[in-house]
Each structure stands twice: as structure tokens, then as C-alpha cells.
Amino acid sequence: MKLITWNVNGIRARHAQFADLVATEQPDVVCLQEIKASPEQIPELLAPGGYWVYWHGAGGYSGVALLVCHSYFTEQVTFFHPSFDIENRVVAADLGAIRVASVYVPNGGKDYPAKLRFLESLVQWARETAAGGQSLVICGDLNVALEERDVHPKERKPNQIGTRPEERALLNGLIADAGVVDVGRRLDPDNNELFTWWAPWRNLRQRNIGWRIDYVLASAPLAERALTAQSRREFGTSDHAPVVVTFS
């Protein structure tokens, strides 16, 4: 299985890049975040042939999407979102024994308590999924740098949102309680430059002075089958890079 997660930062502005990414990578599963469009605003050309597609957005804010290749999962896919998702931030699908979710966690800058509540609900949902015996893959912009090294030294500031202890504790709690593994870190444990987001100024992206906030978290047995995980820093004009993960 090849899986891509990408905060596209506006699908209408980057529809050609999205089409190029799918055509080039031929992924089995695509998770998008921050599509910033309702289904009615998304042109038909963004429903690539050969994929089950679900756009879960409400206009110029937030929104997620999930695409599943017909050749990977031949049955009609049923997409859903959990009850705590009131801002178009989660879409999931059960692909046999694997539940895949595209998730966009609030940044927290405007309403930090709401971010913590969302993370708490996500942890509970993931815990319940794991308790039901399903493998779980959570992909997306989780807006938390899990470790200190997931923020470039030049970007670190005391007590900044995205690095606070309570945020990291919640995300670590999800990993522990749901039995999932940070695939990128598992495959490249000593790399301190696995960044996926860069502020759009001072050539920070070109200099790779960024944050690692986009993840693929997979149940341990599935994570053990992960072969590669790459942040495609050179691709596209979103402030986030696509993360491409392959499993055997």
C-alpha cells in the first residue's frame, strides 16, 4: 500500500498540483487536509478516475478528503466522520480490517481550549477503534510537534502552541492508548530534519527551517510493514509537504 497525506492549503488553488501528485505517485490512499472548499465548489476534474472519493468541507475553512484506489479496495467504500467532528476535520473509512482517517487538528491559535478538546475526543475515538480490534491509520496535519527536535532550533520559542506539554501528552496518549506508531520516526529515528511545514517567508522552506506536524500513525503490526516514509519538501506551493509512505 502506498499512502499520501497532504495539507493542501486550498484544493481549488492547487488542483493541478494535486492531479500531478496522484498521476505521478499512483497512491492507493490519499488523505488531504485544509481543502477549504465544499463538495459543490470542487470541480469534477478533482475526482480522479479509479478512486472512491469523499470531500468533507464547508467552504473556505478547514475541510478534509479521503481517496481510495479501486484496485486497492474493490468494494464500494463507505466514508464517515465521528460525532465529535463539528468543523469538517475528520473523514474515515473502513478498508477491510484497516480503518484509515484523514485528520486536521485545529491550530489552537484562536481557541486553544478547543484544540485540546478536539485532541481529547480524537484520543477517545482512536482508543475505541483499537479496542474493537481494527488496525488504525491516522494521517494528517496534527498541529503538534511531538518532540523538541520536531521544531528547528531557529523556530523554537518558549511555551508556543504546538509544543506545549499538554498537547504533546495528548498526542503521546493517542499513540499509547491506540497502539499506533509514528511511522516516519520509526523508519528514520536519528533524523532531526523530518520537517513537513515551513512558515512562508525568509526562504525557510528552501533552508529546511520548519516544523514536523504532519504524521502517519499506524497500528504496530502495520507499521512494521512500512518500507519508506518521505516528506516531499520540493513539491507544490502549499506551506506543507506531502508525506508519502509505502507499506509491503
Per-region residue spans from a language model:
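Surface-exposed cleft-lining segments at the edges of enzyme active sites
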Residues: 81, 104-119, 155-160
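Conserved beta strand-loop-helix elements of the APE1-like EEP
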Residues: 60-75, 177, 201-224
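Structured beta-strand-rich core segments of catalytic domains in phosphoester-bond hydrolases
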Residues: 36-106, 117
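Active-site-proximal beta-strand elements of phosphoester/diester hydrolases
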Residues: 1-9, 94-107, 139
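N-terminal, active-site-proximal structural segment of metallo-dependent hydrolase catalytic domains
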Residues: 1-47, 52, 64, 174
